[in-house]
Amino acid sequence: MNHVQKYLAQANRQIAELMVQIVRQRAIVKHAFDTGPRSEMAESMLNALEGSLRIFEKHRELILSQLLRQRSE
């Protein structure tokens, strides 16, 4: 496995971990909405996690394009 493949595997792991955190945070936000006043902190954390996910997905796209370039050489 070359360096690019290792970076891709790492990016995939990080994305999977973020997705799990986002699911948990969405449950926290939903619970806050269902039980009382909204929680700005919980919503802010969810927004930050979703923003991080978008960044990691873009990073993964860059890694994939580099991997494809390597294979075509």
Kindly give the residue locations of the regions a language model identified:
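Anionic, Ser/Thr-rich low-complexity intrinsically disordered regions
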Residues: 1-73
